[in-house]
Amino acid sequence: MLAIGLMSGTSLDGVDVALIETNGEKQVKPLNFASYPYSDTDKACLREACRRALTMAAPCFIPEDEVIYQAEHIVTLRHIQAVKDFLKKNALGNQAIKVIGFHGQTIAHRPDLGWTWQIGDGAALAQATKISVVDDFRSHDVQAGGEGAPLLPIYHWALFSEASHPLAVLNLGGIANITWIGADENDLIACDTGPANGMIDDWVKAKTGLDYDESGLIASKGVVHHDLVDAMMSQKFFSQLPPKSLDRSDFSIEAVANLSIEDGAATLTAFTAESVARSLSFFPERPSKIIVAGGGRHNVTMMKMLHDSLKMPVQPIEDFHLNGDATEAEGFAYLAVRRVFNKPISFPKTTGVPHPMTGGRIHYI
């Protein structure tokens, strides 16, 4: 069946839209992809919503605080606009699409407190597009005692089920997460490994006003302060066994505050590489290769540091004729189809749930 997946990640770049054909098992055919950037005004509102959400004891729309209301309206509207434009440009009628997988925008992820919060009105999206929508993918997992993340390991398995195993798929978004893939769908281990683009973006934004370090050019001119990398790696998270997950706010740029822009970028990039390397020690067997998706694969300096730290092949997912910018959006299309068929999307070794379980709320049309 045809399904659309929507993703707006913690980097707050915009809305990614992907179209795939899948049966919710091994059959997956990515078909098309487009990205719709948020405006600077949208990004500012979403950042403030994230800041406020992290001060709360639980998800709660406070009547006198309009910021999160406004943020949810922005997220919903931008996703509606993106889907309608995508359908039009691809000459697709809404009847052709079985389901939309709508991740929403994470504004706080606190599995330690028993909750996670993705804003965006799935019912409104379904009504506006006249296509059934699956949203709220993470809550069921967290309520069952899981981490609620990462959720894409089963999609990574579908993409590489016929490849030589074991291998690992590394997604470099705001946060980095890794999936170790063994022989079958029950042989998956996954976790967040640490910050990826998020801290570097924050550093570059604070120092230059730019949104990110394009191609890792700033970092390439800097010197890595290994003592600071070691200090950041001493945090408890990095010695914890998977499954484990992070909120983008769990780490800050304070550790590199006294460095030059170049040295700070280099040190934070090395921190990402070292945290990924550390994660390999948790797997039962060293993977034969690391396949990289997500925006971080465009960072030449990060990819080189990963190769140097991991001492194994580190290949962009494009080497396998896939689009690394589309992988997350494709994944939520795939998860939506699995939800329609009531198939599990999270597993004990990927999120820590007690047994394989499905997730997501369906808004039927």
Curated annotation (Swiss-Prot):
Classification via InterPro entries: Anhydro_N_Ac-Mur_kinase (IPR005338), ATPase_NBD (IPR043129)
Binding, ATP: G9, T10, S11, L12, D13, G14, V15, D16
Biological process annotations from GO: 1,6-anhydro-N-acetyl-beta-muramic acid catabolic process; amino sugar metabolic process; peptidoglycan turnover
Entry's Gene Ontology molecular function annotations: ATP binding; kinase activity; phosphotransferase activity, alcohol group as acceptor
Cysteine pairings via disulfide bonds: none
Keywords, ordered alphabetically: ATP-binding, Carbohydrate metabolism, Kinase, Nucleotide-binding, Transferase
Pfam families per record: AnmK (PF03702)
EC number: 2.7.1.170
Family in the record: Belongs to the anhydro-N-acetylmuramic acid kinase family.
NCBIfam families: PRK09585.1-5
Summary of the function given for this chain in its UniProt record: Catalyzes the specific phosphorylation of 1,6-anhydro-N-acetylmuramic acid (anhMurNAc) with the simultaneous cleavage of the 1,6-anhydro ring, generating MurNAc-6-P. Is required for the utilization of anhMurNAc either imported from the medium or derived from its own cell wall murein, and thus plays a role in cell wall recycling.
Protein name: Anhydro-N-acetylmuramic acid kinase
Upper lineage: Bacteria, Pseudomonadati, Pseudomonadota, Alphaproteobacteria, Sphingomonadales
Name of the gene this protein is made from: anmK
